[in-house]
């Protein structure tokens, strides 16, 4: 059964399944009628988010080479166990159009199941990517079926599934990642910073400045130079990027990913601030490309320089050859209350 259901912000496609224990195997097959809503470039893995707090990553495959049948594998049994599914319950899956299915359960009386306490399953984040031709019959090389989400992502899921009592659709984030610990620690350890800070940089030398002594600095710098050279060949800088803005009159700048990934900072060039006479309130909304799922990320402006930006880079699975553009929503007096993030795939 498939239905184009109504989401909070937009119409998103849904499909429904009846859970029958005797007929349910190791995998979950999607209705063929739902194929028209799947992206042309199929993800190797998809995220299933339960409204009750659990998060799973499952493999997404063609069923035994059949181009019209798709299944979720390597994780469906875990979902059944974690949610304690009962025979005859209705399962609703809402697809965001790219890689995420929001999941809820209706009892036999067609009432949505609620849970008093939220349970968060922390999973591991690797093996992302796209594959059009990999079939269900192929051997799955990774023994890990789950992903690890950082504190920002888990906070987003919780806030998305809880009733919003504020007048604005704003999600307050947890503390930003600690730059001095490794990626695994970033994902699973409690953050020690006191607040989420946006830092507006007053340094224009964004592309070439090196920071600190790093054993891998030369390698990283050389790799980043290669990415920049390729972008220049494609003519992907300057006013050419204005075509990606929602409002072509807004100020914008292209993010230096080398700095964002390594130093977890969003740096706004002084020349942009000066040229347009920009200034900022105490709090600013950072609008993620996945806004329909996560809402606006509310962050505090402190001093002259925005921190904790790496979570958006991770959440959107941004690669070095992708382009990240920040569009500044400017009011008549130059006040910027919102920054829209656009991810352009390379």
From Swiss-Prot:
Primary localisation category: nucleus
Annotated region of DNA binding: 13-109
Pfam families referenced in this protein's UniProt entry, alphabetically: B3 (PF02362)
GO annotations of cellular component type: nucleus
Keywords per UniProt: DNA-binding, Nucleus, Transcription, Transcription regulation
Locations listed in the record: Nucleus
Biased composition (Basic and acidic residues): 218-229
SMART domains assigned: B3
InterPro entries in UniProt: B3_DNA-bd, DNA-bd_pseudobarrel_sf, Plant_B3_domain
UniProt GO MF annotations: DNA binding
Compositionally biased residues, Acidic residues: 192-217
Residue span of region Disordered: 158-179, 192-243
Record's keyword annotation contains DNA-binding: yes
UniProt-recorded name of the protein: B3 domain-containing protein At5g60142
Protein's organism: Arabidopsis thaliana
């Amino acid at each position: 059964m498939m239905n184009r259901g109504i989401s909070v912000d937009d119409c998103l496609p849904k499909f429904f399944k009846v859970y029958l224990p005797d007929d349910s195997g190791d995998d979950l097959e999607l209705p063929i009628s739902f194929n028209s809503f799947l992206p042309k470039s199929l993800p190797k893995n998809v995220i299933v988010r339960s409204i009750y707090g659990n998060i799973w990553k499952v493999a997404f495959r063609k069923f035994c080479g059949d181009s019209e049948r798709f299944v979720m594998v390597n994780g469906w049994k875990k979902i059944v166990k974690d949610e304690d599914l009962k025979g005859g319950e209705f399962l609703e899956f809402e697809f965001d159009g790219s890689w995420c299915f929001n999941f809820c359960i209706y009892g036999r009386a067609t009432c949505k199941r609620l849970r008093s306490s939220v349970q968060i399953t922390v999973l591991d984040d690797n093996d992302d990517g796209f594959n059009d031709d990999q079939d269900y019959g192929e051997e799955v090389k990774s023994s890990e079926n789950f992903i690890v989400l950082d504190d920002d992502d888990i906070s987003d899921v919780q806030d998305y599934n809880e009733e919003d009592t504020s007048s604005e659709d704003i999600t307050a984030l947890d503390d930003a990642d600690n730059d001095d610990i490794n990626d695994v620690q970033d994902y699973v350890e409690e953050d020690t910073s006191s607040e989420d800070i946006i830092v507006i940089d007053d340094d224009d030398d964004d592309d070439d400045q090196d920071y600190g002594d790093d054993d891998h600095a030369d390698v990283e710098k050389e790799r980043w130079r290669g990415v920049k050279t390729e972008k220049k060949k494609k003519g992907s800088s300057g006013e050419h990027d204005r075509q990606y803005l929602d409002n072509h009159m807004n100020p914008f700048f292209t993010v230096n990913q080398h700095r964002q990934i390594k130093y977890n900072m969003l740096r706004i060039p002084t020349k942009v601030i000066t040229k347009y006479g920009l200034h900022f309130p105490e709090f600013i909304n950072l609008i993620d490309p996945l806004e329909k799922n996560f809402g606006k990320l509310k962050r505090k402006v402190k001093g002259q320089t925005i921190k904790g930006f790496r979570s958006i880079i991770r959440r959107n699975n941004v690669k070095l050859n992708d382009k990240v553009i920040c569009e500044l929503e400017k009011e008549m007096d130059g006040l910027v209350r919102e920054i829209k993030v656009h991810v352009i795939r390379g």
